[in-house]
A protein has these predicted regions:
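Two-component/phosphorelay signaling modules centered on CheY-like receiver
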Residues: 5-23, 89
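Acidic, metal-coordinating helix/loop segments flanking the phosphotransfer/catalytic sites
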Residues: 24-42
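Acidic catalytic/metal-coordinating carboxylates
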Residues: 27-30, 53-57
Length: 115
């Protein structure tokens, strides 16, 4: 889930190389709606998005679906206050915005251990 078309297409390429299907939403509200319909195994969620930010969307999804595995993927995810809020809202991992296949596979492994 990312409002940037560049990062959505880049994410799709990496996720598909890992063997997963890729769906996207460009804002947090659509992310919540899409999660409710599709129930994906994993979600990569940007923090800074329009309408509903990724932290709010993460909290809404994890409140409704406690087993949701959300990986925050944001250029501000390394900032302590955002990391703390992401985990408090139910995220189970943080990825750098410029993640690669190895980063994704490691984050998925860690998410599987948490939830």
């Amino acid at each position: 889930m990312d409002d940037s078309s560049y990062y959505r297409s880049r994410g799709a390429e990496i996720v598909e190389r890992a063997g997963y299907n890729y769906y996207f939403a460009e804002d947090g509200k659509k992310a919540l709606q899409m999660y409710s319909k599709i129930r994906p195994d994993y979600v990569t969620m940007d923090i800074c998005m329009p309408i509903m930010d990724g932290l709010e969307a993460t909290k809404a999804i994890c409140t409704k679906f406690p087993k949701a595995k959300i990986l925050i993927c944001s250029s501000v995810g390394h900032i302590p206050v955002y990391r703390q809020q992401a985990f408090a809202n139910g995220a189970c991992g943080i990825l750098p915005k410029s993640y690669d296949l190895d980063d994704l596979e490691q984050a998925i492994e860690e998410a599987d251990m948490i939830k």
